[in-house]
Amino acid sequence: MSRRRKAEKREVLPDAKFGDVVLTKFMNCLMYDGKKSVAESIVYGALDRIEAKAKQNALQLFHDALNNVRPYLEVRSRRVGGATYQVPVEVRSERAQALAIRWIISAARGRSEDTMTERLSAELLDAANQRGTAVKKREDTHRMAEANKAFSHYRW
């Protein structure tokens, strides 16, 4: 971490189809080897499948899924006198969004459907309905923070 100055945040342009910045961030996290067109086709294909399957606005369902996976508490390690404590801290909104995106993508990659489009659409539908691996990850994170509430006075 630099001591001189804080690195400025890069501005992410909205995506072409929906004009949504969060969707672009999602595609950027999904992308491998700079192949943005592949990531776009996967995400747009998944949103089309959601629209066909759920008969709802796919973008709204995407944002609902993201909000259902966003954590508001997490644990951070803190060394105090030779012992390491897991201290619960609140999650900043930018980090919460980044974690939600990462968790949804990793949960989708771990699913058993044939194509990534199918996996992603299924995981987004599950997350929007408060189930699935990504939501379980969030619940586990919150449970960890709740279990270590006794160490919250070590917060910095």
Swiss-Prot record:
SUPFAM superfamilies: Ribosomal protein S7. GO terms for molecular function: rRNA binding; structural constituent of ribosome; tRNA binding. One of its GO terms (cellular component) is small ribosomal subunit. It holds the Pfam family Ribosomal_S7. The keyword Transmembrane helix does not apply. Disulfide bonds: none annotated. One of its GO terms (biological process) is translation. Keywords: Ribonucleoprotein, Ribosomal protein, RNA-binding, rRNA-binding, tRNA-binding. It comes from the Bacteria. InterPro entries: Ribosomal_uS7, Ribosomal_uS7_bac/org-type, Ribosomal_uS7_CS, Ribosomal_uS7_dom, Ribosomal_uS7_dom_sf. One of the primary rRNA binding proteins, it binds directly to 16S rRNA where it nucleates assembly of the head domain of the 30S subunit. Is located at the subunit interface close to the decoding center, probably blocks exit of the E-site tRNA. Belongs to the universal ribosomal protein uS7 family. NCBIfam families: rpsG_bact. PANTHER family: RIBOSOMAL PROTEIN S7. Part of the 30S ribosomal subunit. Contacts proteins S9 and S11. This is Small ribosomal subunit protein uS7. It comes from Rhodospirillum centenum (strain ATCC 51521 / SW). The lineage of its organism: Bacteria, Pseudomonadati, Pseudomonadota, Alphaproteobacteria, Rhodospirillales.
